[in-house]
């Protein structure tokens, strides 16, 4: 170092004070330029990135809480709908059973009344049939009797018949 | 420097060394162009070159983070970043590019000259001391720096500060200057004799250049680390 300075001095000067000044200014100018063109933008960008990341973390946390809330709500709704469905089914079953009983009761009543009516009808029918059969038999027997009477009106038989009547008369008294 | 002449000129009563001017300017230009190119088209989601820039920023911030707290890290981040890149480029530039004409080299590592490294060291020390005064006020700064742990420590305190300034600058100068000188000597061997010398010198130069790249990077790192340590001595409340 000292030989160097001596060399400098040999050229008719002392220390290179000018160099010191030059380097100081050069360094400051370089620093200013870097600050303007690189340091500032890079740091701004780094800060923006840091902010962005912390925001993202915050919003992720928020989303998670919201999602949990939604899941809970959904679960509740699902449970509710289960209960509701059960009650609806139960209601439907109850009303179905009632309806069935009603229908069956009605049907039974109707069937009974129909049966009764049918019975009555049959009775009526039978009575009518019997009556008409009696009439038919009476007229038939009269006809047969008249035919028999016409054909076999001979003396013997007439005599027997009359005898039997007479005997009958005596018995009835 | 042996026997090499130096080109100087006078301006406003000050002496300037042309070599240092050119070398420093070229280094600064390279630093600025690289940083400028890397910082174009910044995106929230980093890609390619932006990753490189962010890595360098993170690297120099990490050096600061080791010795100062978060608030100071923000204050000195730009300084550490610029310092590191400038010293790094300055250290490396002489390894692959040296321009000499009429026995005067016009382009070499600016950090191979003690005046340059001591200037950088002075900037660091001034910044550190200024920050100390700005933060604690002159009285407390003075007590903290020079009168601790005892009042009779004052001469040692002053001496320590001066030594810090000198070693910070001379350490890097020594390494880079020695590296360049050896490289020049190897180059001299290569061109002094026949083809045999050349064949021997090429791998030697290669190895030494590789080693110098390593040393230059280490020195840039050490310079910024020590800068942050000195700053932390001044601004941290023990």
Curated annotation (Swiss-Prot), chain B:
It is a multi-pass membrane protein. The chain crosses the membrane at residues 18-38, 76-96, 114-134, 150-170, 188-208, 211-231. It comes from the Bacteria. One of its GO terms (cellular component) is plasma membrane. InterPro entries: ATP_syn_F0_a_bact/chloroplast (IPR045082), ATP_synth_F0_asu (IPR000568), F0_ATP_A_sf (IPR035908). CDD domains: ATP-synt_Fo_a_6. It is found in: Cell membrane. One of its GO terms (biological process) is proton motive force-driven plasma membrane ATP synthesis. Keywords: ATP synthesis, Cell membrane, CF(0), Hydrogen ion transport, Ion transport, Membrane, Transmembrane, Transmembrane helix, Transport. It holds the Pfam family ATP-synt_A. One of its GO terms (molecular function) is proton-transporting ATP synthase activity, rotational mechanism. Belongs to the ATPase A chain family. F-type ATPases have 2 components, CF(1) - the catalytic core - and CF(0) - the membrane proton channel. CF(1) has five subunits: alpha(3), beta(3), gamma(1), delta(1), epsilon(1). CF(0) has three main subunits: a(1), b(2) and c(9-12). The alpha and beta chains form an alternating ring which encloses part of the gamma chain. CF(1) is attached to CF(0) by a central stalk formed by the gamma and epsilon chains, while a peripheral stalk is formed by the delta and b chains. Key component of the proton channel; it plays a direct role in the translocation of protons across the membrane. This is ATP synthase subunit a. It comes from Pediococcus pentosaceus (strain ATCC 25745 / CCUG 21536 / LMG 10740 / 183-1w). The gene is atpB.
């Amino acid at each position: 170092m000292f030989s160097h300075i001596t060399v400098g001095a040999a050229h008719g000067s002392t220390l290179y004070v000018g160099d010191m000044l030059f380097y100081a200014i050069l360094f400051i100018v370089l620093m200013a330029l870097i600050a303007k063109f690189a340091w500032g933008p890079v740091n701004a960008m780094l800060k923006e990135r840091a902010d962005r990341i912390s925001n993202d973390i915050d919003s992720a946390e928020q989303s998670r809480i919201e999602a949990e809330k939604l899941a809970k709500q959904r679960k509740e709704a699902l449970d509710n709908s289960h209960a509701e469905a059960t009650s609806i089914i139960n209601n439907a079953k109850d009303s179905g059973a009632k309806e069935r009983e009603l229908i069956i009761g009605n049907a039974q009543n109707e069937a009974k009344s129909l049966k009764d009516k049918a019975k009555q009808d049959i009775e009526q029918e039978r009575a009518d049939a019997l009556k008409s059969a009696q009439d038919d038999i009476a007229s038939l027997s009269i006809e047969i009797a008249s035919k028999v009477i016409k054909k076999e009106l001979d003396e013997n038989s007439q005599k027997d018949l009359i005898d039997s009547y007479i005997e009958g008369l005596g018995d009835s008294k | 420097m042996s026997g090499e002449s130096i080109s100087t000129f006078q301006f406003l009563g000050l002496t300037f060394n042309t070599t240092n001017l050119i070398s420093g300017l070229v280094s600064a230009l390279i630093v600025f162009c690289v940083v400028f190119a890397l910082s174009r088209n910044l995106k929230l989601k980093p890609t390619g070159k932006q990753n490189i820039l962010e890595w360098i920023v993170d690297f120099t911030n990490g050096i600061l983070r080791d010795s100062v707290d978060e608030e100071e890290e923000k204050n000195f981040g730009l300084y550490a970043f610029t310092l590191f890149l400038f010293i790094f480029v300055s250290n490396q530039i002489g390894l692959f590019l040296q321009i000499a004409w009429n026995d005067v080299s016009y382009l070499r590592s600016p950090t191979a000259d003690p005046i340059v490294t001591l200037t950088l060291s002075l900037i660091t020390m001034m910044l550190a001391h200024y920050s100390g005064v700005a933060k604690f006020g002159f009285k407390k700064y003075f007590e903290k720096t020079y009168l601790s742990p005892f009042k009779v420590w004052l001469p040692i305190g002053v001496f320590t500060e001066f030594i810090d300034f000198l070693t910070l600058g001379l350490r890097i100068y020594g390494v880079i200057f020695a590296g360049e000188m050896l490289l020049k000597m190897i180059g001299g061997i290569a061109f002094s004799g026949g083809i045999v010398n050349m064949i021997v010198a090429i791998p030697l130069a290669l190895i030494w250049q590789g080693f110098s790249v390593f040393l230059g990077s280490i020195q840039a790192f050490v310079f910024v680390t020590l800068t942050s340590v000195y700053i932390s001595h001044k601004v941290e409340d023990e």
